[in-house]
């Protein structure tokens, strides 16, 4: 397969990912196939976003990394010292992707490290490893193109997460703003009593203790539930089970109390 055909394969991956949920495992699988190497997509903190193994390495320490989906902190930190594509690193380098304790088994191994950059910042690192055979110039072109694709997907995922977070925050603010003064007071006491993200409480006891009617509590809970902020379920004489669905709620409520 020539460079153009391999580039087209990677283009196909990009077109598929552009309209779907980001799957770094699938991206790593495609890169393994195109680049014929072990492929690791590593986050800023050393987390394995996706990986695909072309040549199995029988080493317990390496297997543990893959199970935990996490490279050790010293290695992850070292990767960030690599500012540009560094190719054909041997087993004696601190940047090798092969276990140094099995030095003699991997004498011919080659590691290539490609920084993943997007939006002007370092987003992660693409680490490629072969038991033998150097990475050629064509391989490096494909590796850098792959890193660009991954960078775009990381940025897209970040943007989606930011959008989701902003939407959740807006929903909470609208729900809180819909409460009357007495309902807001009731909600503050309810979640102070709850002491976490879910639990059981008896509305009548809170109403008596705080000096408000039970209907105020019921109305306040209904407003939050209709906004999708919480879910509640009556358990009869035992009370009402409440679970917070929006993880921004307690923070916004606490911020309101602080003001």
Curated annotation (Swiss-Prot):
A biological process from GO: negative regulation of DNA-templated transcription
DNA-binding region: 203-222
InterPro entries referenced in this protein's UniProt entry, alphabetically: CodY, GAF-like_dom_sf, GTP_trans_reg_CodY_C, Transc_reg_CodY_N, WH-like_DNA-bd_sf, WH_DNA-bd_sf
Entry-linked Pfam families: CodY, HTH_CodY
Primary localization class, coarse: cytoplasm
Region (GAF domain): 1-155
MF-aspect GO terms: DNA binding; DNA-binding transcription factor activity; GTP binding
GO CC field: cytoplasm
Cytoplasm keyword on record: yes
Family matches, as Gene3D superfamilies: 3.30.450.40, Winged helix-like DNA-binding domain superfamily/Winged helix DNA-binding domain
Family: Belongs to the CodY family.
Role played: DNA-binding global transcriptional regulator which is involved in the adaptive response to starvation and acts by directly or indirectly controlling the expression of numerous genes in response to nutrient availability. During rapid exponential growth, CodY is highly active and represses genes whose products allow adaptation to nutrient depletion.
The protein's name in its UniProt record: Global transcriptional regulator CodY
Gene: codY
